[in-house]
Structures are given as structure tokens and as C-alpha cells.
Curated annotation (Swiss-Prot):
It comes from Streptococcus sanguinis (strain SK36). GO terms for molecular function: DNA binding; DNA-directed RNA polymerase activity; ribonucleoside binding. It catalyses: RNA(n) + a ribonucleoside 5'-triphosphate = RNA(n+1) + diphosphate. GO terms for cellular component: DNA-directed RNA polymerase complex. SUPFAM superfamilies: beta and beta-prime subunits of DNA dependent RNA-polymerase. This is DNA-directed RNA polymerase subunit beta.
Length: 1188
């Protein structure tokens, strides 16, 4: 037997063909959401408050301090929040201290700070009753970036940018004349020496001393001349900068100083964030810049006087490692003192080294480091600016390297916690202005924190973020896999990110740093390709938001691959050589061969095994969860694999799903972590179990009660139904499955079914990827799914009185009311068809011009004679089903309703949808098609043992698409069916072709895995042997029931008077320009005329035509279409006197559109009137006959 047995949970064993020992289990797959939110509650929120507070008033006599905060119990439980359309949120109370500095009085008070949405255990938020997900955002990291650019003459120039988390950008660039310029916040450029002088280093010699002698520096100094001898060089530089930042305002050195200080050196206005400081220190550190340079002066330890490195030494990695501690502690530190008129007068510490120029051995180049400022410094310092300029000047000398902005070392993830913190910060800074004003205006003696704090800006910012941010998305809940994928999604779009139109090819492309961090396969097709990605299966965020991936450390000394796991970010990995997970190891755990395949930066090549630093932990660490669910992924073309991964997320949960015979072993973990199953929280023993709840007695005696969800409506209208797996007496451990969720079977993801599939053509019905299906799949409900739709009706107060929910509906027969209860609401369990009444409702009618008699009656009898019109909630077109549930909300019961609403009724209708012609089916390899014919079982081809085939696919769908994985799955699936086993073939480490053929032989199949098929209609065998096997097929969410649509009479657009378009508006089919040409070409003049008039926008014509049809009279001639009138009006507005004449040269009167219509859509009222008129005339004629 090939392969070995592996247990997945307590309910499933699979035969696995994996060969690679996995030393690390998959992490919890939704930790990117849950960990980030927990970190926000533990640290992020506190940091935001500490950033903005304390707040002082303008005279600095009062100060408001932050003490702490407490999050209390949520108002609603999860279930209540869902039912009441409320948010699952907890009140937050913040304690503030108000200090009066004049009197020394301190007032401490707790202030209610609004309700804060709380994340559920599943990593989602419930906002206004709907489940939402905050998608993590992929943004450019703050830090310093260097780039090169080639001008039109082929000359290479350089640029550099300091990008903060928030605040002004500082840019450097060279021009074609070899002069270096700087720009502050995207303004006009000035020579970079001007900024250096403004920082307090004003003399030319001083600048040359700091940066060393080079052409760039000399050229720039020559350009930057002293224009006004009255000013010092620093003051002149300050004024020049002020002129750039505030053109047209009177410039003084003092105002420039305060402006620059506010722009760069004020923590309230400028923030690098922890990650920005980390990136700047890393980039400007002398350690990386000295690597492989030849030192020009000996390096001496300042304390001991010991010579650490002799002049002329090449600074290799080992030399730098030997003096790393001294470098970190400020080796070669020089302190420069700025002059008194500088922006900041504090001394500036730099680390300064001299190295031999790589391009000219006789020249010396100066390298300046920023002397590693502390992590707490979140602003850019003068040392950073000078070190950045030094790096920039070094680039021209060939020292240092430019950055690749698509490298994942330069892009980071803003997960939910950080996005929320930014929103709270935004709200607090709006609140801050408000607080300052109130502190200054009101009487100091009686002020309390409660009085000066207005929480509205903060709650508004949070509400807006959850309700309408691009990153707050309605959860994709087609099935558990789509939920999981949505929680792990990384979007480059959104506020502060890219936009679709501006994103080029480079940003969207796969980068070598994506390996193990972002999936190269799973991304949408279409305009968002490459901008929306998915986290790889082992990906994990570090504290700075960079994605890490795990590797096994290689002990070079011992020549062994250890089981020690090291998590590396993309820029850390660049320094090492990493071997692939499938490198062969010997018994000792070392590499079996002297040469192994490995990666170093962007190169995949062979390396001597003694040079390798790390090894991949698993072959599936490259891909995301959905991609890792595709068996034989290694045999599929990547474009088709992309479709396969995306289509699994569109699978509809079936009534009786089955896990795949051929899986990848990922099905268990994906189902477990998706949040759709019920998982045991503690060890214990089951004491009670039914379909609705399970009780587990813990070892300490306490009782856990797990509620099982039955047929709840998911976000996408499918049935969210959980099924209990345990029975009384079972012992469960923490993490065990208590109940399967939708699309699960025995604790494994089960998106579809395992039908018997044959690759063969049949009467041409599977042309162009169409799918031919056996009627068995319809009769046995194999691909039947349940869909729940929610309809609601509310009663409001109108000007003419309140609307009413009632059984007494005007002009409706008793038959239509048979399923309504005494209130007028449909009973649960009733079968309804389109047009049936769900909730009977009447609205008072506007009483237009009552006659004197009516007014008298009205005065005598009150409301009895008042007119009402029927505004009942009816089943819309194309919908039918069984009423599953009715929920009634009223003010009287204490339900929170919108203002003006007295009662709200929600009706849930369940629909059982069998598979039918027009539904879309797919495999896991991007092989999708539409059901074209459902054939009776007796006519389907059958196997020699009499088993009929379930599905026939076209063999031509395979070769050109290059997704051969489906054929491998087909054969292995048949073997698994015959052997009665389930199989796991993990991606990139699955069944080889030998394993496949061994298993086929073991199952007693023919050596070519094909079989003779017999035609079900004649009993004759087909000419050739056919590939028949079991393939996992799923039914997708694109169902024909949602798309089928027909209209006879419906709404018309207000302006053009033409029918609306689209199924949602109950619109017509557009008969466009080209269709009109077709009718013209055939000379079908009468058809053409009615298409352009009655059926479109001839308002009077269509009324008369309707009347003629109802009375059985000949249809009158059409009039002038409304669009023609619009054209005439347009020409008249251009001053052309245009009139319409008939064949006798008489002018045709064009009616104006009715004034006073304020509705965008004219409904079928005109036709209703025509119907009423016809009915009245018929009644009158009948009465007249009676009299005669």
C-alpha cells in the first residue's frame, strides 16, 4: 500500500501521500484578526489616549489628563444584536483628571465614551445586525526610501524620500547638472545645503567637513550663494525655506523657525510611528552601509584606545559582527553643535566613518550614521536628516543601494487594531480643539471633565469607519471557506492606499518576497487583480506589521537541519540562503546531497549545502488556505488554479454535503478555524445533546452549554445550518468539533459532492464546457441547497394618519387571505408563490376634493368612510417557498425602531433549489461550466457493472487549459471509491504518478484507468475506452433562478418614459441600436414600429393599446415617442424652430411632460386607471342591459 494513515479530528482518517515531515502545525488561521483586536484593547487604545492627552488650555492654567479606561459588559448578546439590528458593542468608560494649575485643585471623573464595537470570537463584528469584517490593509511602510532615475540623456540621478506615518514628506533629488536639491512637503525645490544651513551648520567648510568632499556637494554649494550680507547664512536659509512653504507671506527667520519646528519636530504634527523609527534606524545604520567597503582610517575604541580595525581592512560580515557591539554603542561618534539661530540648537550626535571610494582608490568617502536614536523618538531628528543626505550622496559614489517599493520589507499590514486606533485618534484630535475652547471660555472654578468633553466626534469617527469605510466589508458568507478567506484578505486599496486606476503592473505583480507571506495564486480576476491578496497559510504579523514566515534553522557546524523555528520578515530573509522544504535529508537530519535547491533574494538556484542557513517548514507555506485545498495543484496552470481557488469560495452549502474523496488534508484545519463550526472550549463529557443545544460537563463540575444554529439566513442568503456531531456520553477535549457548520461533514470542509464523472461528448450537449448531468442528482437531492430570503414591512405615521397591519384589505378575495392570521400576517409553514400577500397592510388615501355630501358623511361617521389603499407586502416576482419564520417588532414591546415607525414585521422564506439547467458547476481546478441538459438515469452511459455515470464533461476542456490536476484527481478518486477510503494529497507534496498507479492497481482497476462505457439508450458499448472516475464537483452561487426574468407591464423611467432596465427594477429587455438595424435589414416595419412606440415610450399609444386589447378592439395607430419629443426640445433649446408635420402637412401637437411629477419612476398607475375605467364602463353597460 502506498501512503500512510493520518487522523483528522475524531471523525475522519485519510490515507496521506505526503513524504515531508511537518515540524510546525498551522497557526490559528484567523489570528490576524483576533490578535490584532486584542492588542488594540490591551495597548493600542491606551497609546492613542496618551498620544493626544494631556490637553492644556491656551493660557496653560488648566490641564486635562488621561488616567485609564474600562470596557464594561456588552448591552446585547450576539444573538440579540442580530435580531434587533443592533451592534454588538460594549460601553467604554474613561477616567480623566482635570488639574487647575493656579489653585492646584484636581478633579477626577469617569466619563462615558460611547459604545465600542467588540470583535466576536470568529473575528467578525456585528454592526446594525449585519456581520462585517475589517479587511487588513497593505500600505507602504513609513521610513526613508532611495531610488534612482535615468533622465532623457541616459544620465543616472538619485532621489530619496522620508515618508512619515503622518506629517510632511522630505525629499532629495539630483538634477542633470549634478546639483542636489531638497523639497519639503512637495513644494518647490531648494539646494539641499540651504536646509543644512537652516539646521545650524552654516559655513561652506562646515558642510564639507560633515559630508566629505564630493562633486555633488561642491556643485550645490556653488549654486547656493550668499545673497543678502545683512542676514547670517542660517537666517537667509530659513527665510528662503519659508518663502517656499508660505509663498507671498512676509518672511522672517523667527516665523520660519517655528514653522519648520512644527512641520518636522513636533510630535503632535509629525509621527514616524514605531515602525518608521525602526526602518530609518535600520536603513541609516552604519552596519549595513560599511559592509564590503574598505576602511580608510583605523577604527579606535574611544574608552580603551584599542585599535579595533586597521586602515585598509575590507569590512566583511564577520569583521562587522566582531565590532557590532561597539558600533551600536556609538563607535566614532562625533557631536556637532548647531549655531544659535538654528531651528533646533541641541547638539547633534553622528557616527562618522571614512572609506575608500569604490570607483577611485585615491579618494575617500565619508559615511555618516544617525547614531541610533532611541525607539521612543517618533519624530525625525537633525541627525536623521544629515544621515539621509549622507546616504543619498554615497549612492552617487556607488555605496548603498536603492529600494524596491514592492519589496515586502517596505510594505506592511495595517490590521484591524491599527485601523481602529487611527480612527479613534482622528476622533480625539477633533475633540481636542473642542475641549481647548471650552476650557478657555467657561468658569474655571466649576469645570468638571464631564462638562468639557464632547464625545460626539469620537463616536462619529468610529461609526463612520464601521459603517462606510472601504475596508469595512459585509462578510462574504457563501460558505466557511469564503468566510476564512475574507478574514485573511489583504487589500492595497482603501484610505491611504492605492487606487485601482493609478496602480501599475509592478504593484500587482508577484514579487519574490511574497514567498511564504502572500499567496501568488489567490487574487481576484479583473480590475483588482494583484491589489487584493491573501495571507499565505503560515503567514504571521510581527509587532511592526511586517509579514513573517517560519523557517527551520540549519546548524552549519553540526551540518543538521534543526527543529528550531525562526520567523523572518522579508528584509531579514534577504541576508540568508533558504533551502526548499522538499530537500532530501539523511538519518542524522542533515542534507543528503552536497548541492541543494535554494533561494537567495530573487534567485532560485543550486547552492552547496554547507552554505544554507534555513529551510522551509512546509511545501504549502507558499500558498493561501483556499489554494492549499486544491489537490494536485502542482499539475495545474496557475491561471486555472486562481479560478479554482476563487470558485471554491462561491460554493453553495448543500443539504447533505460530502467531504472530497481526494482532499489535501487542509479541509480539517480550514473548517476548524473558520468560525462556522461549534468547537469545544474545554475538556468534558457530553451530558445532553439534541439538534438545538449540547451540554458538556467540565472536569471541574461546571456546565458549558453550546447553542446549535438551525437554518439561519447567512449574509449571502444561503442557509447557515449546524449539525450536532456528538452524542450523550462522549468525552470531548478542548478544540474538538461539537457540531458541523454549513458545508462541513465530520469536521471537514465539504463544499460539494463526489459524483462519477466521464470525459466524453454526448450529442454535442457538452460543447463549450457545458455539463451534462444525470437526473439522479436531481431526484436524490444531491445538489439541492436551501436559500432563505428576508422580506420586511413597516407601518409608519403618515400625514393622513397611521398605516395599519390588518386582514381587512380592500378589493382582495378571501382566497388570497387564507394563510394570514387574524392580524394579517402570514402563518409559519405556509407555501407561498409570487404575488401572495405576506403582510396585509393599508395606508390612508389622500382625500382629494371631497364633495359636500361626502364631507357631511365624514363629519357624522368619522373615519369609517375613509379611503385606504392596499400597500401589503407581497412575494416578489420569481420568488416562492415556505415561510420559515416571522419576527414582529413593536414600540409597545420595547423594541428600538426608527423614528416614525410603529411596527416592523420580518418574514423569512425558505426555498429549496434543486440543480437545474442553467446552474453553474465547477471542479477545484478552474474547470467550470453550465448545466446544459439533465438526462434520465436510464439514458446515461453506464459502467460494465451497471453503475450509470452522473456527469459528462467535454475532454476538450483539459488540454488547452493545462489543468491536468483534474485528470489525476479523477483516477485517484475512482480508486478511493473502490477501496472505500478517503485520500489526502497535500499540495507540492502529494501523490506522485507511481503512487497514483499503485493505488489504481490496488483498487483493481484497469492499467490505463479507463473503462468501457455502454450507451444507456441502446445498450451498445461506445467505440473507445473512456476515462471515468470520481471528481469533486461544487455548485456555485450563480444560479439560474436568480437570473431568470420576464416582464409584461412594469415601471417606466420618469424622464425618457422608457421601461427601466434590470431584474431588480423589474425592467424590460433593452432593444438596442444594433437590434433595430437587424429589423431594418429585414424590412420588418410593423414589428419595428411597435418596438419603438407601444413597447417603449409612446405614453398615450401604450394606454390606448392596453385599452384596445382589454376590450378586444383593433389597436389604434401609435403616436409620437417621448424620446422624439425630448430630441425636439433639445433642438429648440439650441434656438432651432422645429415642428412636426403629418403627411397632410398639418402640425402635430407635442404634449409636454406632466408638471409636478416628482417621482423618478412612473408606475403602472396609468394602466390601473385604464383598468378601473374599463371595469366601470363594463358595469354601466351591464346595468343598462338589466334596465332594458
Amino acid at each position: 500500500m502506498a501512503g500512510h494513515e493520518v487522523r483528522y479530528g475524531k471523525h475522519r482518517t485519510r490515507r496521506s501521500f505526503s513524504r515531508i515531515k511537518e515540524v510546525l502545525d498551522l497557526p490559528n488561521l484567523i489570528e490576524i484578526q483576533t490578535d490584532s483586536f486584542q492588542d488594540f484593547l490591551d495597548h493600542g487604545l491606551k497609546e492613542v489616549f496618551e498620544d493626544v492627552l494631556p490637553i492644556s488650555n491656551f493660557t496653560n492654567t488648566m490641564e486635562l489628563e488621561f488616567v485609564g479606561y474600562e470596557i464594561r459588559e456588552p448591552k446585547y448578546t450576539l444573538e440579540e444584536a442580530r435580531i434587533h439590528d443592533a451592534s454588538y458593542s460594549a460601553p467604554i468608560f474613561v477616567t480623566f483628571r482635570l488639574i487647575n494649575k493656579e489653585t492646584g485643585e484636581i478633579k477626577t471623573q469617569e466619563v462615558f465614551f460611547g459604545d465600542f464595537p467588540i470583535m466576536t470570537e470568529m473575528g467578525t463584528f456585528i454592526i446594525n445586525g449585519g456581520e462585517r469584517i475589517i479587511v487588513s490593509q497593505l500600505v507602504r511602510s513609513p521610513g526613508v526610501y532611495f531610488n534612482d532615475k535615468v533622465d532623457k540623456n541616459g544620465k543616472v540621478g538619485y532621489g530619496s524620500t522620508v515618508i512619515p506615518n503622518r506629517g510632511a514628506w522630505l525629499e532629495l533629488e539630483t538634477d542633470s547638472k549634478d546639483i542636489a536639491y531638497t523639497r519639503i512637503d512637495r513644494t518647490r525645490k531648494i539646494p539641499f545645503t540651504t536646509l543644512v544651513r537652516a539646521l545650524g551648520f552654516s559655513g561652506d567648510d562646515e558642510i564639507l567637513d560633515i559630508f566629505g568632499d564630493s562633486d555633488l556637494v561642491r556643485n550645490t554649494i556653488e549654486k547656493d550663494i550668499h545673497k543678502n550680507p545683512m542676514d547670517s547664512r542660517t537666517d537667509e536659509a530659513l527665510k528662503e525655506i519659508y518663502e517656499r512653504l508660505r509663498p507671498g507671506e512676509p518672511k522672517t527667520a523667527e516665523s520660519s523657525r517655528s514653522l519648520l519646528e512644527a512641520r518636522f519636530f513636533d510630535p503632535h504634527r509629525y509621527d514616524l510611528a514605531a515602525v518608521g523609527r525602526y526602518k530609518i534606524n535600520k536603513k541609516l545604520s552604519v552596519k549595513t552601509r560599511l559592509l564590503n567597503q574598505t576602511i580608510a582610517e583605523p577604527l579606535v575604541d574611544a574608552e580603551t584606545g584599542e585599535i579595533l580595525v586597521e586602515a585598509g581592512t575590507v569590512m566583511t560580515r564577520s569583521v562587522i559582527d566582531s565590532i557590532a557591539e561597539q558600533l551600536d554603542n556609538g563607535l566614532n561618534k562625533i557631536t556637532y553643535i548647531p549655531n544659535d539661530s538654528a531651528v533646533l540648537t541641541a547638539p547633534v550626535d553622528l557616527q562618522k566613518f571614512k572609506v575608500v571610494a569604490p570607483t577611485d582608490p585615491d579618494r575617500v568617502v565619508t559615511i555618516i550614521g544617525n547614531a541610533n536614536p532611541s525607539d521612543k523618538v517618533r519624530i525625525v531628528t537633525p541627525a536623521d536628516i544629515l544621515a539621509e543626505m549622507s546616504y543619498f550622496l554615497n549612492l552617487a559614489e556607488g555605496i548603498g543601494r536603492v529600494d524596491d517599493i514592492d519589496h515586502l520589507g517596505n510594505r506592511r499590514i495595517r490590521a484591524v487594531g491599527e485601523l481602529l486606533a487611527n480612527q479613534v485618534r482622528l476622533g480625539l484630535s477633533r475633540m481636542e480643539r473642542n475641549v481647548r475652547e471650552r476650557m478657555s471660555v467657561q468658569d474655571n472654578e466649576v469645570l468638571t471633565p464631564q462638562q468639557i468633553i464632547n464625545i460626539r466626534p469620537v463616536t462619529a469617527a468610529i461609526k463612520e469607519f464601521f459603517g462606510s469605510s472601504q475596508l469595512s466589508q459585509f462578510m462574504d458568507q457563501h460558505n466557511p471557506l469564503s468566510e476564512l478567506s475574507h478574514k485573511r484578505r489583504l487589500s492595497a486599496l482603501g484610505p491611504g492606499g492605492l487606487t485601482r486606476d493609478r496602480a501599475g503592473y509592478e504593484v500587482r505583480d508577484v514579487h519574490y518576497t511574497h514567498y511564504g507571506r502572500m499567496c501568488p495564486i489567490e487574487t481576484p480576476e479583473g480590475p483588482n487583480i494583484g491589489l487584493i491578496n491573501n495571507l499565505s497559510s503560515y503567514g504571521h504579523l510581527n509587532k511592526y506589521g511586517f509579514i513573517q514566515t517560519p523557517y527551520r534553522k540549519v546548524d552549519r557546524e553540526a551540518g543538521v537541519v534543526t527543529n528550531e523555528i525562526v520567523w523572518l520578515t522579508a528584509d531579514e530573509e534577504d541576508e540568508f540562503i533558504v533551502a526548499q522544504a522538499n530537500s532530501k535529508l539523511n538519518e542524522k537530519g542533515g542534507f543528503a546531497e552536497p548541492i541543494v535547491m535554494g533561494r537567495h533574494q530573487g534567485n532560485n538556484q543550486e547552492f552547496p549545502s554547507d552554505q544554507v542557513d534555513y529551510m522551509d517548514v512546509s511545501p504549502k507555506q507558499v500558498v493561501a488556505v483556499a489554494t492549499a485545498c486544491i489537490p494536485f495543484l502542482e499539475n495545474d496552470d496557475s491561471n486555472r488554479a486562481l479560478m479554482g481557488a476563487n470558485m471554491q469560495r462561491q460554493a453553495v452549502p448543500l443539504i447533505d454535503p460530502k467531504a472530497p474523496y481526494v482532499g489535501t488534508g487542509m479541509e480539517y484545519q480550514a473548517a476548524h478555524d473558520s468560525g462556522a463550526a461549534v468547537i469545544a472550549q474545554h475538556d468534558g463529557k457530553v451530558t445532553y445533546a439534541d439538534a438545538d443545544k449540547v451540554e458538556v460537563r467540565r472536569e471541574d463540575g461546571s456546565l458549558d452549554v453550546y447553542q446549535i444554529q438551525k437554518f439561519r439566513r447567512s449574509n449571502s442568503g444561503t442557509a447557515y445550518n449546524q449539525r450536532t456531531l456528538v452524542k450523550v456520553g462522549d468525552v470531548v477535549e478542548k478544540g474538538d468539533f461539537i457540531a458541523d457548520g454549513p458545508s462541513m461533514e465530520n469536521g471537514e470542509m465539504a463544499l460539494g459532492q463526489n459524483p462519477i464523472v466521464a470525459y466524453m461528448t454526448w450529442e454535442g450537449y457538452n460543447f463549450e464546457d457545458a455539463v451534462i448531468m444525470s437526473e439522479r442528482l436531481v431526484k436524490d437531492d444531491v445538489y439541492t441547497s436551501v436559500h432563505l430570503e428576508e422580506y420586511e414591512s413597516e407601518t409608519r405615521d403618515t400625514k393622513l394618519g397611521p398605516e395599519e397591519i390588518t386582514r381587512e384589505i380592500p378589493n382582495v378575495g378571501e382566497d388570497a387571505l387564507r394563510n394570514l392570521d387574524e392580524m394579517g400576517i402570514i402563518r409559519i409553514g405556509a407555501e407561498v408563490k409570487e404575488g401572495d400577500i405576506l403582510v396585509g397592510k393599508v395606508t390612508p388615501k389622500g382625500e382629494k376634493d371631497l364633495s359636500a355630501e361626502e364631507r357631511l358623511l365624514h363629519a357624522i361617521f368619522g373615519d369609517k368612510s375613509r379611503e385606504v389603499r392596499d400597500t401589503s407586502l407581497r412575494v416578489p416576482h420569481g420568488a416562492d417557498g415556505v415561510v420559515r419564520d416571522v419576527k414582529i417588532f413593536t414600540r409597545a414591546n420595547g423594541d428600538e425602531l426608527q423614528s416614525g415607525v410603529n411596527m416592523l414585521v420580518r418574514v423569512y422564506i425558505a426555498q429549496k433549489r434543486k440543480i437545474k439547467v442553467g446552474d453553474k458547476m465547477a471542479g477545484r481546478h478552474g474547470n467550470k461550466g453550465v448545466v446544459s441538459r439533465i438526462v434520465p438515469v436510464e439514458d446515461m452511459p453506464y459502467l460494465p457493472d451497471g453503475t450509470p455515470v452522473d456527469i459528462m464533461l467535454n475532454p476538450l476542456g483539459v488540454p488547452s487549459r493545462m489543468n491536468i490536476g483534474q485528470v489525476m484527481e479523477l483516477h485517484l478518486g475512482m480508486a478511493a471509491r473502490n477501496l472505500g477510503i478517503h485520500i489526502a494529497t497535500p499540495v507540492f507534496d502529494g501523490a506522485s504518478s507511481e503512487d497514483l498507479w499503485d493505488t489504481v492497481r490496488e483498487a483493481g482497476m484497469d492499467s490505463d484507468a479507463k473503462t468501457i462505457l455502454y450507451d444507456g439508450r441502446t445498450g451498445e458499448p461506445f467505440d473507445n475506452r473512456v476515462s471515468v472516475g470520481v471528481m469533486y464537483m461544487i455548485k456555485l452561487h450563480h444560479m439560474v433562478d436568480d437570473k431568470l426574468h420576464a416582464r409584461s407591464v412594469g415601471p417606466y423611467s420618469m424622464v425618457t418614459q422608457q421601461p427601466l432596465g434590470g431584474k431588480a427594477q423589474f425592467g424590460g429587455q433593452r432593444f438596442g441600436e444594433m437590434e433595430v438595424w437587424a429589423l431594418e435589414a429585414y424590412g420588418a416595419s410593423n414589428v419595428l414600429q411597435e418596438i419603438l412606440t407601444y413597447k417603449s415610450d409612446d405614453v398615450n399609444g401604450r394606454l390606448k393599446a392596453y385599452e384596445a386589447i382589454t376590450k378586444g378592439k383593433p389597436i389604434p395607430k401609435p403616436g409620437v415617442p417621448e424620446s422624439f419629443r425630448v430630441l425636439v426640445k433639445e433642438l429648440q433649446s439650441l434656438g432651432l424652430d422645429m415642428r412636426v408635420l403629418d403627411e397632410d402637412d398639418n402640425e402635430v401637437e407635442l404634449r409636454d411632460l406632466d408638471e409636478g411629477e416628482d417621482d423618478d419612476v412612473i408606475h403602472v398607475d396609468d394602466l390601473e386607471k385604464a383598468r378601473e375605467k374599463a371595469a366601470q364602463e363594463a358595469k354601466a353597460a351591464f346595468e343598462a342591459e338589466g334596465k332594458e
